[in-house]
């Protein structure tokens, strides 16, 4: 890759992101702009996938809201995300947890990883 492009992308990368993987439960603090007012909205759920590296990396978080599954994909390096907190580390044997979409209730549980 061109050194100039590498230098520009390195400036854009965030260094305040915690380490998390698929199966971890995270709390994402998202900045929401409503007119002239800006507030923080919290989206808490299980990380079902992480994709890519560098500036284009994304992760998808899934939660159940009012009995309906909601998935939201966030870029890792976006300024719209104020912070990410890792609530618990889950023990899974897959990198992509798409099977959670078909499961509900106790079948969708993920055991906690021992540290």
From Swiss-Prot:
Tell me which Gene Ontology terms the entry assigns under biological process.
translation
**Under the GO molecular function aspect, what terms does this record hold?**
structural constituent of ribosome
Q: Does the keyword Ribonucleoprotein apply?
A: yes
PROSITE patterns given for it?
RIBOSOMAL_L19
Alphabetized Pfam families for the sequence: Ribosomal_L19
Domain of life (superkingdom): Bacteria
Identify the keywords attached in UniProt to this record, alphabetized.
Ribonucleoprotein, Ribosomal protein
| Cellular component aspect of the GO annotation | cytosolic large ribosomal subunit
Could you tell me what this protein does? This protein is located at the 30S-50S ribosomal subunit interface and may play a role in the structure and function of the aminoacyl-tRNA binding site.
NCBIfam families found in the cross-reference section: rplS_bact (TIGR01024)
Q: Which family does it belong to?
A: Belongs to the bacterial ribosomal protein bL19 family.
Q: What is this protein called?
A: Large ribosomal subunit protein bL19
Whichever gene encodes this chain, its name is: rplS
């Amino acid at each position: 890759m061109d050194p100039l492009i590498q230098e520009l992308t390195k400036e854009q990368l965030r260094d305040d992101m915690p380490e998390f993987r698929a199966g971890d439960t995270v709390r994402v603090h998202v900045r929401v702009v409503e007119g002239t007012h800006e507030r923080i909205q919290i989206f808490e759920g299980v990380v079902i996938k992480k994709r890519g590296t560098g500036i284009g990396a994304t992760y998808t978080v899934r939660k159940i809201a009012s009995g309906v599954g909601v998935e939201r994909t966030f870029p890792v390096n976006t300024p719209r995300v104020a912070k990410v907190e890792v609530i618990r580390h889950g023990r899974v044997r897959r990198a992509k947890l798409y099977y959670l979409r078909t499961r509900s209730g106790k079948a969708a549980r993920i055991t906690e990883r021992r540290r």
